[in-house]
Amino acid sequence: VYGDEFAEEIHELKRKSAAADLMFIPARIRHLGTDVNSVILANMRDSLPSNVTVISKTAADRILADKDGTVLGVEAGGETYRCKYLVAAPGREGAEWFMKEARALGLETQSNAVDIGVRVESPAEVYEPITKICYESKLVYFSRSFDDRVRTFCMNPYGFVVTENNAGLQTVNGHSFAHKKSGNTNFAILVSKQFTSPFNEPISYGKYIASLANMLGAGPIVQRLGDLRDGRRSTVERIRRGLVRPTMPSATPGDLSLVLPYRFLKDIMEMFEALDQVAPGANSRHTLLYGVEVKFYSSRIALTNQLETKFRNF
């Protein structure tokens, strides 16, 4: 278990972070690893009672409810599944679908922010002062230029950068194994953007930004931080000369300034300056940036204290 917030080392990390205008949020975490996680999930599935049926590879199409305010079930894969109780957990990829369903049902919604940024990859030694103490370090920064909320997310010591497919849109993510290790640490730097009226399509906005990277790079783009600062694209040769060996060699060397708006780039650059005070070397010109990473969130639904919508048992 990592991240005992009462440890002396955690207190020192908080002090260093505060001096760099960063808020350090400790989290106690037990790391399983992608390889072990699949075993645990299989054990959970096998432990379910015999009268529980799990239907996989089947997307929910429509939520059914009557005019009297009671949920009836769902339509999925050409079948109708009736139920007394319905729990909706659409995940990030289902956020847009769930928003449409909520509107169709007349549920009161409030748009969430969208998080847009990059996946960072550096030598693992750079972040060892943090990751040895707290595996999942959460650092929050409010940018000087725009007062935007910028945060680190999903840190993977000795991990790997991977492609994530969001309904045909290729974005980036990261993971780590329990046994197999790389020489790098990766994590996301995300800028949170909450839009105001009249614009109310944060998911569409995030997908558009991600589509620009796909258009320019036929998938995710990778760029050295130094090249981005100097206003030039990264090339295969520049990546090869760098000190960081990319764990996702399929990414196309390119220029993220052609993808991310200036506001997001400025926020990310400021975040690196702050991180460098806590983990010297974070702001190195050899640091690799993969783009883009986007986190979509479902709209907030008006709920009772029992987490129930206006439809009974939903």
Where do the protein language model's features map onto the residues?
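Residues forming the flavin
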Residues: 1, 5-314
